[in-house]
C-alpha cells in the first residue's frame, strides 16, 4: 500500500505544478496582450499616481506667480512676446529635473499629460519630458518633448496616427501655445538635425520606434500657429498678442 501512495502524491504534485504553470503562462500572455493593445499595466499605474501629484504641483506653480526679481524685470518689458520669452527662460532655469512644467494636450488622441522638465529615464516615468538642450515654448526655435509608447501610461503610444493639420496644445504657466502638425518622420536615434532651429517656432514630439524597440525614433513635427499670454505675461487689452494672437500658416 505505501508503494502506491508515493506515485499518487507525485501525480497530484505534477497536476498542481502544471496548473500553476498554465495560469502563469496565461498571465504572461495576458500581460503581453494588454501591453500590445493598450499599455503595460503596472508601470501605467505608477505613472497615473505620479501624474495626479504633478497636477497638484502644476497648480501650485501657476498660483505662485513671478518672484520679486522677475516682477521687477517684467515691469520694464512692454511687449508680451518679450515677457513670455523672459518667463520661459526663468522657468527653465529654476525648475528642477522631473518637476512639473506644463501640460501637453493632443485632441486627436484624446490625451492630456502634465509635462516634466528633462528626458532622463526617471523623468519620463512621470510623463512626457522636455529635452534639456531645446528651449521651452516662447523662447523661440524648436522645442522637443519625449515620451514612452508602451510603458508608463504610454503618452505617445499613438502619435503615429497624427496627421498634417492636427492640433497640439502646450499649456505653460505663462502662455498657451497651439501647434499644427506638419509631418511625421522616422529617424535614427542620433538624428539631432530634427531639433535644429529652422527660422520659426516648432514643436517636435519624439518616441522610440517601432513599438517595443529603440532601434529608431518617430518624430512628429509641428509649427506654432497661435500664442495666448497668461498671468504675468499679459499686458491687457490692446497688447501685441492679446489683440490677435501670434499666428502663422503651417506649411
Label every PLM stretch briefly.
Residues 1-11:
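N-terminal Lys/Arg-rich, disordered targeting/topogenic segments
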Residues 9-10, 15-251:
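Solvent-exposed, non-transmembrane regions of membrane-associated and secreted proteins
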Amino acid at each position: 500500500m505505501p508503494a502506491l501512495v508515493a506515485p499518487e502524491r507525485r501525480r497530484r504534485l505534477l497536476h498542481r505544478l502544471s496548473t500553476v504553470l498554465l495560469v502563469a503562462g496565461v498571465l504572461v500572455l495576458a500581460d503581453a496582450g494588454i501591453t500590445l493593445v493598450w499599455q503595460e499595466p503596472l508601470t501605467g499605474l505608477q505613472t497615473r499616481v505620479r501624474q495626479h501629484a504633478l497636477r497638484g504641483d502644476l497648480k501650485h506653480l501657476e498660483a505662485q506667480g513671478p518672484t520679486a526679481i522677475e516682477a521687477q524685470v517684467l515691469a520694464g518689458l512692454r511687449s508680451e512676446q518679450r515677457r513670455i520669452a523672459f518667463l520661459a527662460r526663468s522657468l527653465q532655469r529654476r525648475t528642477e529635473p522631473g518637476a512639473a512644467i506644463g501640460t501637453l494636450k493632443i485632441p486627436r488622441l484624446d490625451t492630456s499629460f502634465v509635462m516634466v522638465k528633462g528626458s532622463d529615464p526617471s523623468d519620463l516615468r512621470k510623463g512626457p519630458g522636455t529635452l534639456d538642450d531645446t528651449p521651452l515654448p516662447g523662447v523661440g526655435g524648436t522645442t522637443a518633448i519625449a515620451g514612452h509608447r508602451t510603458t508608463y501610461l504610454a503618452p505617445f503610444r499613438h502619435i503615429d496616427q497624427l496627421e498634417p493639420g492636427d492640433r497640439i496644445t502646450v499649456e505653460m504657466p505663462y502662455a498657451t501655445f497651439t501647434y499644427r502638425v506638419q509631418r511625421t518622420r522616422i529617424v535614427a536615434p542620433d538624428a539631432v538635425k530634427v531639433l535644429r532651429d529652422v527660422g520659426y517656432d516648432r514643436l517636435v514630439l519624439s518616441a522610440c520606434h517601432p513599438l517595443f524597440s529603440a532601434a529608431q525614433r518617430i518624430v512628429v513635427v509641428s509649427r506654432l500657429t497661435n500664442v495666448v499670454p497668461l498671468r504675468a505675461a499679459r499686458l491687457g487689452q490692446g497688447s501685441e498678442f492679446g489683440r490677435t494672437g501670434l499666428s502663422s500658416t503651417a506649411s
